[in-house]
């Protein structure tokens, strides 16, 4: 026999129907706030239940368990824990901009500590919470049956201030979520008033009075474009940043002090995260982290190592930790029973409509009540005017029913009026009492006329709303806590996280590049043996060495006449003896393409200037720097080369500089670059020097008469010669002798102009570096041998050199601890 209690259904259809019912229940009745009062059902039921229980600000606190039990039993049958958690949140200053519950006991902390059990804590409504329920007994809102029909509960609260804006809302429903930030009470009220006074105002105009969120924990909002987008569309994102200060201790060390955290950030988790980053060496320079917060406020201290930069560490903290977070707007709320993403204007419009309805319903309630009372008083006045006859009717009637009927018939009274006459005490028959009744009646008639006028004039309703909100603003508003920073959010670029310091960039002949701290090499006297400066093998040597800063942009010009770009910090740091990283791992070089020149291109130093190119075959070209602003990842053509030619040198010039070019066989030519017009990137250039047989260009430099020309030969000889010994001539000549080339000193390794104060770093093909001051190199004439500046091992040759800033110390000091630690980290 078939069981009549079993019903055959289609599983697919049942799943769809049941899930939709469940989803709508969660969306409408659990997770999302109503746009009118800004409350989810659980919060509304808690506040209404507390009000009905009499747990108001003027009464003592009541046990939380009693409140949650009452709310659960009457209105919210979903478990006491969810009710208690919602009530606890309404009592936390770091969660609500204006707390709706006044908690007594342990209600948690912004460190993530939970509240004590509900049997231990007590609560009552806060004063401002009463404003949400004010006039609820005047038929201002609709009521509905509770879950079992035994009680009545409000569908929405009167909400005499815009709670959805003031306290915001968060919630996750089925397939949707809401995230509305809190705002300043005064600003929210001013925004509502602006819309009432200027219905055609724009979002930009609204932002003049409500510029952005005001979080209970304060902090900084970085930029305003995200706010405008969110206010305009209901969706957007802003960056929240902790309020920090960098203090200097009496010992000269720096510390970072955090006094305000972004909204919703757990302070303890931030503490743990910073410690973990320091332990994992992902964030260096931090020596201690302490939470010194107290009743006086938040104070979170991060101690910095003496040699570290607090600014760089702080930027790293912003990038790696919750000291900087994003807040995503998703202003989803229930509007007319339907979930909808709302703009700021729509939220305010809905609130104004709700307040108009509340005022109209309250006014009607007061008017009906006044009319009912006036009706009674009118009957009493009739009775007092005919007192003897009324007394006679009552005395001669056998029952009160007969008396009431007679009074109604004789004086044309209603049932309520006649009953009021019968209920009237004898004391009210005095003349004084009649005057009181008449006065009350007259006052009621005036009140009824005023209430009728309110209902007839919408502008009076608007005025009442504004006046009552102004009173709330006067009583409860407080200053803004969150500071809105002017300008857009600056995304943290990599260089914001890198401490700016002087470094050396070396590039070996086989293409290994690395970055070293410049202070690893200190000046030696002329003739010193030098220290091992690179980790090249016997068959490799350093070709390029440049002194720069970690934040500078480096342009890499290749033998193919192409140019690439890198930030100095993008080049990995290695120890002195480490080999480095193959340059092909950083730049997309073609087969056979090698770096010939690295030039430092600081923006402030390149504006309006040109690049001066010199090739191995003596061809020169001048091109404006601005043509190299946008260098692709795969490089850019810098100049067109003739077959067999290579680019060997690039200079940054003003357009009016004198240029000197030196050749391998010891000749040089000086000319003014103005004789060469600016050319495009694809141009080949013109002849700069006419080379002798088997000769080639080894260097080019800008030159002024107050400078000196420094030349160094392959066998370690060098000399300085006054620039005045090099006359300016036209380009394209064979040049004049600049050094006496012999087997002893070898051919020219390079040429550069100096002022005599610089340090020079000389590199051999064995990877040995010596640093010495230019002043230690003798001054001699043009066609001389020079002096020995570096003792070379057998088969060693000088391949290149570069100028660096001078140092006071003359003793070579190598920080081996730092070298070893860096080498081990990189090699591993």
From Swiss-Prot:
The keyword Isomerase applies. This is DNA gyrase subunit A. It catalyses: ATP-dependent breakage, passage and rejoining of double-stranded DNA. The keyword Calcium does not apply. The active site is at 120 (o-(5'-phospho-dna)-tyrosine intermediate). Transmembrane segments: none annotated. GO terms for molecular function: ATP binding; DNA binding; DNA negative supercoiling activity. GO terms for biological process: DNA topological change; DNA-templated DNA replication. It comes from Streptococcus pyogenes serotype M1. GO terms for cellular component: chromosome; cytoplasm; DNA topoisomerase type II (double strand cut, ATP-hydrolyzing) complex. Its main location: cytoplasm. Keywords: ATP-binding, Cytoplasm, DNA-binding, Isomerase, Nucleotide-binding, Topoisomerase. It is an enzyme of class 5 (isomerase). The gene is gyrA.
